[in-house]
Swiss-Prot record:
Cellular localisation: Cell inner membrane
Function: Probably functions as a manganese efflux pump.
Coiled coil start-end: none
Keyword NAD among UniProt keywords: no
TM helices/strands, residue ranges: 33-53, 61-81, 101-121, 126-146, 160-180
Disulfide feature: none
Gene: mntP
Pfam families in the record: Mntp (PF02659)
Keywords tagged on the record: Cell inner membrane, Cell membrane, Ion transport, Manganese, Membrane, Transmembrane, Transmembrane helix, Transport
Protein name: Putative manganese efflux pump MntP
């Protein structure tokens, strides 16, 4: 359940971006829509793997504070998403050439890199976790394009707000769980 919530939260940037694309490019063909959703999902799959292996490389040095690191990273990302959701500016949509599709997929998956670092402190199967994150992102991004096509850019901010709230919740859950395990609370 926690992994699905995390996957949903990480997918909100990609879904919001693709929702804006749906509002902007209403006549885009299904193949292009599928490709964009695939790239968004692929980067959400790839970045936690990279973050995980970066985290493992220095985990022995910070294992006593890993829960604080996870808490601060998730809360920072969550508050960043909340700030974006409350901003009066609507994010830039991708143009539809291959270069900007890659840039958009990379930019919306940077949060997943940081989450991959936090997952290196947990007893998880990183490949399975990253695969679920990528699949959820793909599905949500695909659906988001069509929602954007019909509902417009107004929903973009609500998706960012929900994703930010979920990341903050997960950060607090990790912190409280570890503090309870250590007998601090």
């Amino acid at each position: 359940m926690q992994l699905l919530l995390l996957s949903f939260a990480l997918s909100m940037d990609s879904a919001a971006l693709n929702m804006a694309n749906g509002a902007r490019y209403k006549s885009l063909g299904f193949g292009k829509i599928l490709f964009i959703a695939f790239m968004l999902g692929f980067f959400q799959f790839l970045m936690p793997l990279l973050g995980y292996f970066l985290g493992i490389s220095f985990a022995k040095f910070i294992s006593s504070i890993d829960h604080f690191i996870a808490f601060f990273i998730l809360c920072f990302l969550g508050f960043k998403m909340l700030k974006e959701a409350c901003s009066s500016e609507v994010g830039e949509s991708l143009s539809m050439d291959i270069k900007t599709i890659f840039v958009g997929a990379f930019a919306t998956s940077i949060d997943a890199l940081a989450v991959g670092v936090t997952l290196s402190f947990e007893a998880v199967s990183i490949f399975e976790s990253a695969l679920i994150i990528g699949i959820v992102c793909f599905a949500l991004s695909l659906a988001a394009f069509y929602i954007g096509k019909f509902m417009g850019e107004i929903l973009e901010k609500k998706a960012l707000f929900l994703g930010g709230a979920i990341l903050i919740f997960l950060g607090f859950k990790i912190l409280i769980t570890h503090l309870l395990e250590e007998g601090v609370l």
